[in-house]
Amino acid sequence: MVEKKIYAFVQARLSSKRLKNKVTKKIKNKTLIELLLKRLSKSKLINEIVVLIPKKKNENKLEKLIKKKGFNVFRGSKNNVLERFYKASKVYKPNYIIRITADCPLVDINIVNNLIKIIVKKKYDY
């Protein structure tokens, strides 16, 4: 059986209109994005986690933080998030993409794992 490449693509940015730098706000000395990446890392079904951020210079701080924590970063369009996902998928070539937003640090990893099991077992396209 061919192993499926299952990637979590986390969309993130610092330039939120309502709350600037939202993903770097801290809860108990951890940024929201750190909390999220730690949760996602607990999955034994996700092969790789890639954080997709805009190419804008003001996002360099976020890229540095993510890489310091040992995660890959893909940079793409600020305004066209779908294009960012599309281009990242061309680079990483996953069989399945789990889309996660970085401003949601309370993602339940059990739900994510159950979702992965279902999509792989049923051979869903998306």
PLM-predicted stretches and their roles:
Residues L32-I49, L62-K64, K68-K69:
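A short, N-terminal amphipathic alpha-helix
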Residues A8, I49-V51:
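Hydrophobic/aromatic residues located in beta-strands of well-ordered beta-sheets
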Residues D103:
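Substrate/cofactor-recognition hotspot
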Residues P54-E59:
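A conserved acidic beta->alpha catalytic loop
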Residues F85-K87, Y92, L106-Y126:
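Conserved donor-nucleotide/metal-binding helix-loop-beta segment in metal-dependent transferases, i.e.
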Residues K67-N80, K90:
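Conserved donor nucleotide-binding strand/loop of the catalytic core
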